[in-house]
């Protein structure tokens, strides 16, 4: 690993390429592992309402470690933090392969993901700056969504063939991410020498939360991204139950193909946002956020595969255009106030709290027997109303 502490701010520097490759492999493993583990739950006859619980234990790790992972990212070279985090993911995936309870193994992957996220986004502001930061976020999101696209499909297709093969492929992807992390230049720690007293760390994290919440721009970004990712992860589980009801298809692969359409759309939307939206014109993304909810509502009423594909791709386009500028806004403003690692850790707390809440409501709705189509209609309508309210609030403040 290079010991240089100087950044080549080119969008295609060696360090940036290594970050993007590592992110692709890590996100590929995350998404393949989700669908492979869901297939394992089906094979072992777990109840349907337990499926979102799997994701809830994952995001629970994010919430539990939120006060600490931002400081970890800012106290060490971020490339090494990413390597350690991917090592934890590798251990979690391997444990599921060897028959350990899937919820426990997936929790360990969640711990790795919690440590990984502040470092992967925080390092962007160290490898590039200014106007290139939005473009770097576009590359990161495009890499992530390409991994979602391929990882989701690979997880479902391989699981239809053999669940153990799918799980092993996830472990290999995490191993590749660890190797890619080695090639990220060792940059100076952003905030070395901080106290590791847990009480002080928690207090510092709460201060970072307060600081970001009091700033109108970062509060706007936090609420917007939290709503988006909470809705996004809920949609993934909605599709798993919606496909057999609306389309009459019962395999593991079809929900992954539909999720892939969302992923393709987000790549397109992220690219458009990088060209059309700057930090000064972030509000341009808000109509796209409202349209996400409207299109989800329309999608829930479909009974044919081709319209479902098209509508999910449109949801993805709107999603990419919506979330990329909000991420860039938080990184730029947060880096100057609380540090990039802490800013992303606070963002993770918001996003994963939203995921936990939405998944909990969704799991409860399934448990009490509400049909999946009405769940989808209500979900889309509420999301559109929430983004509309956020936009009105942002314009007033």
Swiss-Prot record:
One of its GO terms (molecular function) is lysophospholipid:sodium symporter activity. Disulfide bonds: none annotated. The chain crosses the membrane at residues 18-38, 53-73, 91-111, 145-165, 167-187, 227-247, 257-277, 281-301, 305-325, 344-364, 367-387. Residues 1-17, 74-90, 166, 248-256, 302-304, 365-366 are periplasmic. It is a multi-pass membrane protein. This is Lysophospholipid transporter LplT. SUPFAM superfamilies: MFS general substrate transporter. Residues 39-52, 112-144, 188-226, 278-280, 326-343, 388-397 are cytoplasmic. It is found in: Cell inner membrane. GO terms for cellular component: plasma membrane. Keywords: Cell inner membrane, Cell membrane, Lipid transport, Membrane, Transmembrane, Transmembrane helix, Transport. Catalyzes the facilitated diffusion of 2-acyl-glycero-3-phosphoethanolamine (2-acyl-GPE) into the cell. PANTHER family: MACROLIDE-EFFLUX PROTEIN (PTHR43266), MAJOR FACILITATOR SUPERFAMILY (MFS) PROFILE DOMAIN-CONTAINING PROTEIN (PTHR43266:SF2). Belongs to the major facilitator superfamily. LplT (TC 2.A.1.42) family. InterPro entries: LysoPLipid__transptr_LplT (IPR023727), MFS (IPR011701), MFS_trans_sf (IPR036259). The keyword Cell wall biogenesis/degradation does not apply. Pfam families: MFS_1. The keyword Nucleus does not apply.
